[in-house]
Amino acid sequence: MKKILSLMLVLILLVGALVGCAYSSKAGEDPVVTAKNWIETQIKKNTLFSFDYAGKEYTEHIKSWEKTVEEKENFWVVTYTNGDVVAWSEITLDDEMAAVEWTNYFKNNGSVDSPVISDIQAIDSVVQVENPVLTSAQGSNSLANDFQPFSIDLNVEESFKMASMGGRSSHGAFPYFDICNGEYGIIGGIGWTGNWQAVFSAQDSNVRIQAGMQQTQIALHAGEQMRTPMVMLQFFKGDQDAGHNAFRQLVLKSYTPSDASGEPIKKAMMSIGVSSVAGYGIDELLNQVAFFEAINIQYDSLWIDAGWYGDIKGDNLNTGVWREQVGNWYFIPEAYPDGNARELGDYLASQDKEFVLWFEPERAVYGTKLTVEHPEWFISDEDNPKQEFMLYNLAIDEACDYLIDMIGTIIKDSKVTWYRQDANFEPESRWKTADKAEGENRVGITEIKYITNEYRFLDGLVEMNPGLMIDSCASGGRRLDLEMMKRTIPLWNSDYTTHPDTATADGNRALCYNLTWWLPIHAGGGANVTAWDTIYRFRAAMMSGMQINIDSTKLGVVRNTLIEQYYTCRDFMTGDYYILQQGFDKEIDTKDACYEFYMADQGKGYLMAFRPENCKTESNSYRLKGLDATATYELEVADTGDKLTMTGEQLMTDGLKVTYPRANLSLLIYINKI
């Protein structure tokens, strides 16, 4: 009997070692306490991350490493040493937001290659959530269901895997998730702008989370160092909306860049854009700015998109051949005779306007200036070395330094205040080509060096141009991971709207409002959805930032009214947010929708309600959330001035009845606590 009990104890301990150790949280516990206890448990049990070493699995080899723990206030460095190889984690606890963030590193201090480090999981840990339901979202695929949430009951599915594709972090999958049960839970994010994968496995009330790069099998060279993706977990109590609103505030605090004043950005912009038209030279642009002033249109920035650069002359100025010129990063001489846009930048600055300028530095056309001058800095397709598009190899430090100086100088000379970075290219296959050139046991090293230098490049531009703000586009919303969010604001959240034959206002509305559930600051597209000719289309894209094209400024009185409403509503977009009703997939264009933004500390906010063109619903009651049940609220329809008074309890219990006199109608309703 004693032998049986001993065997059972060994099995229990073995299972615990294999799956990590979960701190047992409770529904009513302070999330900060849960977060701190959880991270201390992972440090103690060596269950924060994992990797195979010299052919041995993590649980077989980790106990042979020498371990040290350095702890300061809410910061830990956990170091493992095995001969000349060092692995360590740098961990931070935000004790206001109940959030834990860490990044893992490896270094070979020896004089020869290290043993192979493989299957690196940036997180390999267990969290305890009873009856766990996993929720994430679709990635950016240029579809109406971009960022549409989906849920997996882990008690039923037991295991679920998701992964990005092509080498861009939110293409095909979304690097954020929550695991909750209606009473408490965690919300997490991955900080890696390349390929990643995550696996969620449940057993009883434990959920094992494994996430990292998709492929790693690396022998580090002498003196070489590498990092893993960053991981963040935020603990919360309450329902799923409580978790998402806590996460939105965390993003605003810790994963949003600062503006020129040094303060975290709280909004995007109303931008007027010149899109893919090379013929707009300096004189034409100055004339356009004068036109905006003449018609008294309110806006924040002038946006010059692709097409201002390269060898374009004469009759070709207006052809918009922007793809053919990437790699020729100099202003079109005929359109910009001074070689820069300084006159425009100076004028916009004098009017307190921002200047957005587009680049795509990671891709170049074979034969352009940069590929000719530095062919050693480009990765071609393995089977077609002279393929049209080549990848600029940021993994090379010298190439990264050169790019910082070249683009940083263009920005400085033209007084650009927003650097808009596109990336219309899937780098994955080129990374693999470069890995093969490195020799054996170097799988994943190019991606690691490339992404590490991607961050160094962006940080270098800001260091060279203090106050510079950055937009990450990547074919519209395909680089939305936490590391990129630290540095950028997505001003174009999806390329869905660049397909006018298939895109609809409601498809645009769905992807914009779904992304807002996770990320509070981004800009809705819409410039190419037929026209900005209706109130409905405008409100469908009304996020923290918006873009309208020059032709869209000719909207008469409605234009100024809509823009005034946008500026009023924008102030509430960093508050609490609730999706009260909407349709998914085929129902996007047939089901009514209602969204709520509310600033609890101000007692103010608004509802945005939509009845799509193909929706038969003539009225519906929407139950509001997050209000003070004991307070009285005044609700005002923005377009008519009609007002209604109700208590918070009535609004949250019975709901607000909204009547739609017709289809293709949107209603903006202001909320004011009185």
Describe these PLM feature segments.
Residues A17-E29:
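Sec-dependent signal peptide cleavage junction
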Residues M1-L7:
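Positively charged n-region of N-terminal signal peptides that target proteins for export
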Residues K267-D405, W418, E428, D435:
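Aromatic-lined carbohydrate-binding/catalytic grooves of carbohydrate-active enzymes
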Residues I218-K237, N664-N672:
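Short Pro-Gly-centered flexible turn/kink motifs
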Residues N104-F106, L348-S350, E398-L482, I489-P490, ...:
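Active-site and adjacent substrate-binding regions of carbohydrate-active enzymes
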Residues G28-S205, Q214-T216, T632-T640:
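Polysaccharide-binding surfaces and accessory modules of carbohydrate-active proteins
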Residues N453-L644, V658-Y660, L665-L667:
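Active-site-proximal substrate-binding groove within the catalytic cores of carbohydrate-active enzymes
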